[in-house]
Amino acid sequence: MTNLTRFSVAPLHTMTRRLADVASGRVAPDLVITGARVLSTYSERILRDRELWITGGRVAAVKPAGAHKALPSGFTIYDAAGGIIAPGLVDPHIHIESSMVTACAYAEAALLNGTTTIFCDSHEIGNVMDTAGVEAMLEDARQAPLSIFLTVPSTVPATSAALETAGGDLTPDKIAGLFDRWPEAVALGEKMDFVPVCMGDERSHAILAAALQRGRPVSGHVYGREFVAAYAASGVTDTHEAIDRDIADDLLDAGVWIFLRGGPPTTPWHSLPQAIRTITELGASHKRTAVCTDDRDADDLMLFGLDWVVREAVKAGMSPEQAWSMGSLHGATRFAMDGEIGGLGGGRRADLVLLDDGLKPQSTWYGGELVVDQGKITSLLDQALSQRYQYPKAAYATVKLPAQMKLTPELPAKACTVNAIKTALPGITLIHEKVAIKPANDWDTLFARHGLCFVAVIERHGKSAGNVAHGLLKDFGLKRGAVASSVGHDSHNIIVAGTNEADMQTAVAAIGAQQGGVCVVADGKVRAMVPLPIAGLLSDKRVTAVAEEVKLLKKEWAEAGCTIPYMGFNLIPLSVIPEIRITDKGLVLVPQMELAPLFE
């Protein structure tokens, strides 16, 4: 069987004579793709009547149609039948864990959608298992049929131990060690704590130094024009959060790459049309922009890959050639890999996609091997996907729950003010709403009148004696039962919301029994469950199986009445995004970085 990993193609310096011989026509290539139009990401043109000569998993040359007729015999021909051949897509910013599958399983969906290289920030598993989790995912990535590079998690935990309990703590020394041990650790992941960075926080700048002194670029995550100058001066050279025209202008002029994030319409990350308009209305060059996916669940990963983002960019005003370049060459260039990926120049990896006129991938080659043929995975890829990395035993034992816990608060019998968390689409920003309560008859009536339900966060790393924090959600819309998840960003404690204690207990118990997952419960029964036994974040199944589980989860989630999708629900504990959050330590007022009581 062909070794189908990033390492299956020999380094360029070992192949230059062979490539030159093939490009000159002295030696036959392994593969000739004929009858093609070639999308050049270098000139942003579609070159008609071309063919590609491929050898050893690399592009030897792009030639005029019919040039292969003068070659020595012994090569395979693939007829593109007039389709467009383009370089494989390069996603410059993703979190594999958001898809709830392993790196190997992720590869199947990526290749079906024409993505052949990704740059992954694995801070989710780092928050649970520290460096052991990051390195387990790197081992997984090395065996995957996909080129996966690491942007080392930079902000683990997202905030301080005073505000939440995380399973991991990636110190500057640990981050330096990851860079030194893993050549595929090519950059520092998104530095989310931009305020401490701009204020000169010692730990934050020690982490930046660990990357910069090794010549690694630094990825960012920033809101607010007032922070751009200090952030850029600290060495940050990309961000995926800029959708406002003014801050985008400032970032581009400060030399910061902008990754335009394209999320499906039903998710908190649906901002691409606005982001594209921001760039086009500025009249700015798109050469320092790329597109990325950031977060996708397994279902959306199958339907809304980076290819979908590229097509959405075209709808928003980019030319097809510009959009595909933003999805391939630009991401490669940002990480100084444009000599290897992102285009079809001689010597580049033969990571190719056959497109129809609507830029929909039909077939994919990875390192010169056909892995998707007319929308179906080949037997070669199927075999590679079946040889999955086995995560260590510790990864299957990360949910440590207290023997007993109360998931609903004691409700006051007298008038009070509730510090409620008001949810609203798209679900990223949560509003701090003070609700005045004057108990008259019973709390059930008051809950209905004010649109309230219970929420709790349970520490699950075994570090804080099973902390349980209580809160109340407003306008979450839950009509019955409970919903729960072990993917409570970023520390990934368990978050549960419900209308009653019993169903909330059932939901948390179901997650504990599976060592992680996302579930919907009603009338004491689990109606839908996506088990996530690896670090409480990942399934051990193929992506197609997980996608089906997620579809059922979404159906039951909607029927329960929830007004924000489950991925938005998972963000409720994320204590770095305004205005109010709940962690295992309690309610967090984000602007003040302080804890607040539930009742006043």
Swiss-Prot record:
Enzyme class: hydrolase
SUPFAM superfamilies associated with the record: Composite domain of metallo-dependent hydrolases, Metallo-dependent hydrolases
Catalysed reactions, as listed in the record: adenine + H2O + H(+) = hypoxanthine + NH4(+)
Pfam families per record: Adenine_deam_C, Amidohydro_1
Keywords recorded for this protein, A-Z: Hydrolase, Manganese
Alphabetized InterPro entries for the sequence: Adenine_deam, Adenine_deam_C, Amidohydro-rel, Metal-dep_hydrolase_composite, Metal_Hydrolase
Key word Glycosyltransferase present: no
Its EC number(s): 3.5.4.2
GO biological process: adenine catabolic process
Cofactor entry: Mn(2+)
GO molecular function: adenine deaminase activity
Similarity comment: Belongs to the metallo-dependent hydrolases superfamily. Adenine deaminase family.
Protein name in the entry: Adenine deaminase 2
Species this chain originates from: Bradyrhizobium sp. (strain ORS 278)
